[in-house]
Amino acid sequence: MRTQWVELGERSYPIYIGDGVLDQGVLAEHLVADRALLVSNETVAPLYAERLAVPGAEVQSVTLHDGERYKTLQTCEQVYDALIEGRFDRSATVIALGGGVVGDMAGFCAATYQRGVGYIQVPTTLLAQVDSSVGGKTGVNHPRGKNMIGAFHQPRAVVADTGVLATLPEREYNAGLAEVVKYGLIRDPAFFDWLEAHVDALRRRDPEALAHAVAESCRNKAEVVAADEREAGERALLNLGHTFGHAIETYTDYCTWLHGEAVAAGMVMAARMSVRLGWLQRNGLERTIALLEAFGLPTRPPAIPEARFRELMSVDKKNRGGQLRLVLLRSVGDAVVTGEFAPEALTDTLVEAV
């Protein structure tokens, strides 16, 4: 088992990473009281819920529908109902067992129930293990934009059992690899090199390679969050491809494209725009496309009219004073958040996508 700490002073917490960590009793160390509510979905709960039993603790459960389209305030009411009907007080712990949708919603409910209770993330998808479970971003979607309603609320711990990824459907596994690639693109060129050299091992889910990829991704995420918890600066770099990607997800009603797939196409759009601006060498774009395609990911968005694409991007949370701000690349391993770019570079990128 590897342990990576997210250093936030008194609110620091560990990320436990490795095959079989669900069975190593780490959950019990982070329960404040002997009662917890397990929040999961209809896909994951039958597979892993029993492994989260804590000796001497009462763990109640609520099971939600699976899928991004259910990441809503209405779904959260099921969690609030379970907390209230179960008479949970502020000493309660919410345990999020599932992918990013479950983790985001359970974390948001924990942040808002009685003005805040503790929670533990137990991510069961690659995307959740390397990204959404770490950093305290919680929230739900709104019909007009992704993650528009939410709160920063750090977990007490993250338990990332890489063994559960062995049975993850290939499409979901590949979607998680998009977020892994992102860390290499924004700040870790050596990790990007390593990914290029270990495509085959990661595609076949070699346990050692997978544990390393998750650990390095979590290390990068933890370092960024420790330096900029509230996304005032560096943390916004973690959104490479997300402004384009969120527009894709919203346009397709959160039904057709997985989050990681949309991010993959969005990262390529950001790279193409960076080349147009003269910031990124064409070789950097070609390496990005080649690696994402090697991981079975889309590198072009669906056909979205330029005006509609712009409209969807205009509600992005990185924007300031009505100005669109994007994460762009200067090289592989070097990214920048900026609203200062030639407008035609964006126009040409959107038009090319259509």
From Swiss-Prot:
The keyword Metal-binding applies. GO terms for molecular function: 3-dehydroquinate synthase activity; metal ion binding; nucleotide binding. It is an enzyme of class 4 (lyase). Pfam families: DHQ_synthase (PF01761), DHQS_C (PF24621). Keywords: Amino-acid biosynthesis, Aromatic amino acid biosynthesis, Cobalt, Cytoplasm, Lyase, Metal-binding, NAD, Nucleotide-binding, Zinc. NAD(+) binds at residues 66-71, 100-104, 124-125, 137, 146. It is found in: Cytoplasm. One of its GO terms (biological process) is amino acid biosynthetic process. Its cofactor is Co(2+); Zn(2+); NAD(+). InterPro entries: Dehydroquinate_synthase, DHQ_synth_AroB, DHQ_synth_fam, DHQS/DOIS_N, DHQS_C. Its EC number is 4.2.3.4. Zn(2+) binds at E179, H242, H259. Pathway: Metabolic intermediate biosynthesis; chorismate biosynthesis; chorismate from D-erythrose 4-phosphate and phosphoenolpyruvate: step 2/7. Belongs to the sugar phosphate cyclases superfamily. Dehydroquinate synthase family. Catalyzes the conversion of 3-deoxy-D-arabino-heptulosonate 7-phosphate (DAHP) to dehydroquinate (DHQ). This is 3-dehydroquinate synthase.
